[in-house]
Each structure stands twice: as structure tokens, then as C-alpha cells.
Curated annotation (Swiss-Prot):
Light-driven anion pump. Binding affinity for the anions is in the order, bromide > chloride > nitrate > azide > bromate and binding is pH dependent. This is Halorhodopsin. Residues 57-62, 143-145, 196-207, 270-291 are cytoplasmic. It comes from Natronomonas pharaonis. One of its GO terms (biological process) is phototransduction. The chain crosses the membrane at residues 31-56, 63-86, 121-142, 146-169, 173-195, 208-231, 241-269. The modification N6-(retinylidene)lysine is found at K256. It comes from the Archaea. Pfam families: Bac_rhodopsin. SUPFAM superfamilies: Family A G protein-coupled receptor-like. It is found in: Cell membrane.
Length: 291
């Protein structure tokens, strides 16, 4: 018995046929606010990579080097991600479900009106790769153990993936917000580890002063992301796509590049404070355990 698929709607056919990367690329270029939010970040990420590599060139301790590498990877991921957005590779046009504030919206692409809103889903890929690096650097600075690091990083990735699901779900308005709630629940786990567990570890490790500064910066900035999501085109659509993109880009600038500079500046001046074992593995200079 042959099972037939439901007919494809005319709008779906038009969307598949008309929306190309080239049109999305030109859409970005033709919106100064949107374009600046992406290209400025590409430039800042590139400059940050060069600066951070120069700053950390003299590090010798394995733990300090691991913190440095994980921190430098943040702008490395960002420059690739923002290039994907600027090129139209990681942007789509999605029709919002019934009940969504942007239901029935359309966008001009290639001189024609296309049903849907522009969704910059590539940002979620960025966060899924860059935020674990931020947490790895923070956890190592705090002198945390492998269990807490694993917990924070895995829940962080879950937060990003479920956030992506919330952005891409078009079957139900309610399901979008359900995914959003799951993402926020995962975020609460990350916040607990940052604010409670790692704060205690950092105090014992002697890095509490810098950790607390970076912790507060990270928590305040990261709390801004779900707020921008809720207010932007993916949530209640109060903010247009250009403003939404700049909201995310501003948060990225502070939560990534400024965060990384502060951490690496501290690291290069206090290498002996963070030196020692990596995770739970004793360093080569450590005293072996008794048999």
C-alpha cells in the first residue's frame, strides 16, 4: 500500500523556490542596522583573536594554557558564526504559527514579498559552541572538579539546543514557548553552579576576586539573552529583526570579548595563582599518592 504525502501548500513551494542565500545576503546588506550588528562583530572577533594570542604567548602552566585556549576559542567561534549569518548561510525565513504576534508577516526578498519572518538561527549554533568554552574557562579559574564542569557544560548545551528548537518550531505557538521554558530551566542549573558551587570553589582556590567579577558579568549578560528572545521577532515580536540582532550582538560583545580580555589579563598577571592540576588529574610536579 502506497502512502501519499499531504499536498504542499503554494506558499511553501514559493518559499523553497524563491528564498536563496544570495537574497538573504542582500537582505542583510540592505538593512544598515542588521548589517552593522554582524560585520562589527566579525571585525571585533578577528581583532580579539589577534590580541588574545599575543597576550597569552608567554604562558607556561598547563592549567593556565587550557584556560587561555578555551577563552580564545570564544572569538574563533564567533567570527565563523557571524560570517555564516552575514553570508545568509545560517538565516532562514519562517512562517510563524497561528497565535504568534508575527503571524501573517512577510519580508521583501529579491524584489518579491515572501511570507514569514527572518530568523537568525545560526546564533544558537554559536552559543552551543562558545558558551561551553566560557564555562570551561570559568570552572578552571574557580578550581572546580570534572563533575561540576561536565554538569554546567552539558546543561548549557541543552539550553542552547532547546532555544534553537523554540526558534525553529512553526507547528504550534504554545510549543515554541514550551521549548523556551525547557531552555530556561536548563539555564537555572547553569546559574546555580555559577552562583553557588563555583563561587565556593573559587574562594578555596584563591581566585574569588576575579571569579566573582566574571561571574556577575556573565550572569547579568546571559540573563539578557532570553529577554531579547522574548521581545524579539521569535517571541512577542516587539523588536524588529535589526534591533533584535543588535540586542544579541551587544550582549555578545560584553559577554565574550570583554569577558575574555578581563580573564586573560588576570591570567597573564597571576599565572601562579591558577597553576596546578587540570581537573582532577595531578600535575606532573605533584607528589604521587602512597600505594
Amino acid at each position: 500500500m502506497t502512502e501519499t504525502l499531504p499536498p504542499v501548500t503554494e506558499s511553501a513551494v514559493a518559499l523553497q523556490a524563491e528564498v536563496t542565500q544570495r537574497e538573504l545576503f542582500e537582505f542583510v546588506l540592505n538593512d544598515p542596522l542588521l548589517a552593522s550588528s554582524l560585520y562589527i562583530n566579525i571585525a571585533l572577533a578577528g581583532l580579539s583573536i589577534l590580541l588574545f594570542v599575543f597576550m597569552t604567548r608567554g604562558l607556561d602552566d598547563p592549567r593556565a594554557k587550557l584556560i587561555a585556549v578555551s577563552t580564545i576559542l570564544v572569538p574563533v567561534v564567533s567570527i565563523a558564526s557571524y560570517t555564516g549569518l552575514a553570508s545568509g548561510l545560517t538565516i532562514s525565513v519562517l512562517e510563524m504559527p497561528a497565535g504568534h504576534f508575527a503571524e501573517g508577516s512577510s519580508v521583501m526578498l529579491g524584489g518579491e514579498e515572501v511570507d514569514g519572518v527572518v530568523t537568525m538561527w545560526g546564533r544558537y549554533l554559536t552559543w552551543a559552541l562558545s558558551t561551553p568554552m566560557i564555562l570551561l574557562a570559568l570552572g578552571l579559574l574557580a578550581g572546580s572538579n570534572a563533575t561540576k564542569l561536565f554538569t554546567a557544560i552539558t546543561f548549557d548545551i541543552a539550553m542552547c539546543v532547546t532555544g534553537l528548537a523554540a526558534a525553529l518550531t512553526t507547528s504550534s505557538h504554545l510549543m515554541r514557548w514550551f521549548w523556551y521554558a525547557i531552555s530556561c530551566a536548563c539555564f537555572l542549573v547553569v546559574l546555580y553552579i555559577l552562583l553557588v558551587e563555583w563561587a565556593q570553589d573559587a574562594k578555596a582556590a584563591g581566585t574569588a576576586d576575579m571569579f566573582n567579577t566574571l561571574k556577575l558579568l556573565t550572569v547579568v549578560m546571559w540573563l539578557g539573552y532570553p529577554i531579547v528572545w522574548a521581545l524579539g521577532v521569535e517571541g512577542i515580536a516587539v523588536l524588529p529583526v535589526g534591533v533584535t540582532s543588535w540586542g544579541y550582538s551587544f550582549l555578545d560583545i560584553v559577554a565574550k570579548y570583554i569577558f575574555a580580555f578581563l580573564l586573560l589579563n588576570y591570567l597573564t598577571s597571576n599565572e601562579s595563582v591558577v597553576s596546578g592540576s587540570i581537573l582532577d588529574v595531578p600535575s606532573a610536579s605533584g607528589t604521587p599518592a602512597d600505594d
